[in-house]
Amino acid sequence: ARSYYTTKQGSSVADMKGLKIRMQNNAMMVDMTNVLGGTGVTGIGPNEVYSAIKQGTIDGAENNWPTYQNMGDYEAATYYVLDEHTRVPEILLASAEVLSGLDAADVEIIKQCAIETEAYEKQKWAEKEESAEKIVREAGCTITELTPEAYAEFQAAMTNPSDALGGKSLYEKYGTDYQDVIDAIAAVGEAY
């Protein structure tokens, strides 16, 4: 999951106010930071984040544990807030056109390999996250795990109308066309 990291300690939406945060070049991601009271900044490549933080161009960025650690950003922005605002799914795709040209036994082999690959990738990613988190914690960075109330506050910022979005919520601006998908995901989450 991706979380925010900054040069200032924070544990609430109010603590995001005024922070310049490097974001992916994606309007929804920028707006997400803006509704939290920060300013989403684009145009800074992943390899430039460390120096942009050191120079004061930005106050932080957002990413996962391995990237935060591997890029050395944890040395420049020592406060990591575990808000886990996005999760990027890892997807395996196969062309229906190609699969239709294979015999059934080969298609089954490919499907089985995909299942095994999924389990292997999850294991390796979990190991990398654990290793990166350990390095960051041992370096003395401050890791903030949100309270249930603070987590709910971050979620509410996404669903409540925002001046930053002309009175719309982030969900209204970006989720309307995908409401059936959002509802299906929420239903799965409720089952756990």
Name each model feature, range by range:
Residues 1-192:
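N-terminal secretory/targeting leader peptides
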